[in-house]
Curated annotation (Swiss-Prot):
Keywords: Adaptive immunity, Coiled coil, Disulfide bond, Immunity, Secreted, Signal
Coiled-coil ranges per UniProt: 28-62
Source species of the chain: Mus musculus (Mouse)
Tissue expr: Mainly expressed in liver. Also expressed in brown adipose tissue.
Protein's name in the database: Fibrinogen-like protein 1
GO molecular function: identical protein binding
Disulfide bonds: 85-114, 250-263
Reported function: Immune suppressive molecule that inhibits antigen-specific T-cell activation by acting as a major ligand of LAG3. Responsible for LAG3 T-cell inhibitory function. Binds LAG3 independently from MHC class II (MHC-II). Secreted by, and promotes growth of, hepatocytes.
Amino acid sequence: MGKIYSFVLVAIALMMGREGWALESESCLREQVRLRAQVHQLETRVKQQQTMIAQLLHEKEVQFLDKGSENSFIDLGGKRQYADCSEIYNDGFKQSGFYKIKPLQSLAEFSVYCDMSDGGGWTVIQRRSDGSENFNRGWNDYENGFGNFVQNNGEYWLGNKNINLLTIQGDYTLKIDLTDFEKNSSFAQYQSFKVGDKKSFYELNIGEYSGTAGDSLSGTFHPEVQWWASHQRMKFSTWDRDNDNYQGNCAEEEQSGWWFNRCHSANLNGVYYRGSYRAETDNGVVWYTWHGWWYSLKSVVMKIRPSDFIPNII
């Protein structure tokens, strides 16, 4: 009888243990569900915070690009004023970036991108890279300059007034670096590059050509078109200041400022088309002798340097 009683007690204890285990398991499951919900909630909040931070950073970046920043310029230590990027290079500053220069006859400093590669000392007067800047502008903008003087690949036009102040200092070489949408590169180089003053309507003068892209500026690629396609000794034109040789208005038709003739075999300030572009119009970023009139290039850099430049390797 005692054995039966003991067995019953053990059975009851086991049953109670199972019920307790079941209750404990159910409680653990509920706790797991609660914790998972909390984790999911926290993950959602973290993602929301990350999105907000990204938006704030983007807004700050846009404000920075709009306003510019002194911190975007490379500090020269207040050593002296420089007439162009070649002087900066030969004074020991070999890093490409934005610097401030003051040509000999300039009344004030202005910012410019110095390309310290490719032999160093290049003053960049124009850049096209992504179509972020509008180059269909009037006379005053082209005279004084416009664009992004903050980002290293930012688009800008240095200004006809500033280009004149640079090129009257001596004999300068112009180098034009071109890139297409198939990742090919080419260049055109001209000796004796000079832009006239305001009275000459910033007339273009170029000398001997060399390079791989062909001579689109002087129009010597074909004698029958040179009379209307050459840009040599052409005055600068904009939509509101027509100085070309065409009965119409080249700048208005091509939607850019340039040294138009009737109208062009090169227009590096033309409309920027994102992607390889071919059509029955020539108002893109054009260099005829490399890709013809109906191909708009991906990127352009126009840069100048004294023709007698000797790099200081120290």
